[in-house]
Amino acid sequence: MSGMSGSHAVSQESEHVLFAVRGSCDMCKERIEKAAKGVNGVLSAHWDKDTQMIHLQYDPQKTSPKAISKAIAKVGHDTDMDKADKAVYDKLPACCHYR
């Protein structure tokens, strides 16, 4: 008997999505993935610097790609759906500037 008390069959209810996220370095990768994983319902987030794409696994009952995109934009990275505020973007380290 495994401790199933707080867990659900989330993997069966989860969905995958890919969308573009602009960034330029490993610091960007860390920031982008941290922002995505900070959204309740995100199970995994992997951003690829070369393709500029993020692969997400999430629980659609708890969040949506749009909500995750907004969280990423709030930390300074443009996505297919949302543009980061210029003031936030300007505060990124120089190596993270992609515009």
Please give the residue ranges for each predicted region.
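A generic structural motif
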Residues: 52-57
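Short acidic amphipathic segments
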Residues: 36-48
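Conserved short beta-strand edge segments in small beta-sheet-based binding/regulatory domains
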Residues: 76-88
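Helix N-cap motif at beta-to-alpha junctions
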Residues: 59-65
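Short, low-order "capping/linker" segments at domain edges
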Residues: 90-99
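Short, surface-exposed ligand-recognition loops at beta-strand->loop->(often short) alpha-helix junctions
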Residues: 19-28
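Bacterial Sec-dependent N-terminal signal peptides
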Residues: 1-13
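Short amphipathic alpha-helices in soluble, non-transmembrane regions
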Residues: 32-33, 67-76
